[in-house]
């Protein structure tokens, strides 16, 4: 029984949201039931909520389809956001100068696991 897979992962790479903002949302769902986590994400008014909700649904689908795990028995075991590449842009300013603008991206990873019996 030790060789049976009990977790599934989903990752979204180079998502156009700052890692700092996405971490505010990801901290809300870590360690929770998947049903509870989906409810939290649905009613959280932050820009990262729809992105993280999509990744969580993908992780649940991976668990069901790839590993035949029961969705009712899953919880968010790991959830983290890493910084992705930064897109560097410039905004024109007065007297021919320019100010840098950093468009930050993130890599979002969600791991769901089966609860211990």
Swiss-Prot record:
InterPro entries membership: Ribosomal_uL22, Ribosomal_uL22_bac/chlpt-type, Ribosomal_uL22_bac/org-type, Ribosomal_uL22_CS, Ribosomal_uL22_sf
GO function terms (MF aspect): rRNA binding; structural constituent of ribosome
Keyword rRNA-binding: yes
Family indicated by similarity: Belongs to the universal ribosomal protein uL22 family.
The protein's assembly and partners: Part of the 50S ribosomal subunit.
PANTHER family in the cross-refs: CHLOROPLAST 50S RIBOSOMAL PROTEIN L22-RELATED, LARGE RIBOSOMAL SUBUNIT PROTEIN UL22M
Known role: This protein binds specifically to 23S rRNA; its binding is stimulated by other ribosomal proteins, e.g. L4, L17, and L20. It is important during the early stages of 50S assembly. It makes multiple contacts with different domains of the 23S rRNA in the assembled 50S subunit and ribosome.
Protein's UniProt name: Large ribosomal subunit protein uL22
């Amino acid at each position: 029984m030790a060789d049976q897979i009990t977790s599934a992962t989903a990752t979204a790479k180079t998502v156009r949201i700052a890692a700092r903002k996405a971490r505010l949302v990801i901290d809300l769902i870590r360690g929770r039931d998947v049903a509870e986590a989906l409810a939290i994400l649905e009613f959280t008014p932050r820009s990262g909520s729809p992105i993280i909700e999509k990744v969580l649904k993908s992780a649940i689908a991976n668990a069901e389809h790839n590993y035949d795990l029961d969705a009712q028995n899953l919880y968010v075991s790991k959830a983290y956001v890493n910084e992705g590449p930064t897109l560097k842009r410039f905004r024109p300013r007065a007297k021919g100068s320019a100010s840098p603008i950093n468009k930050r991206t993130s890599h979002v990873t969600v791991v769901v696991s089966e609860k211990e019996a």
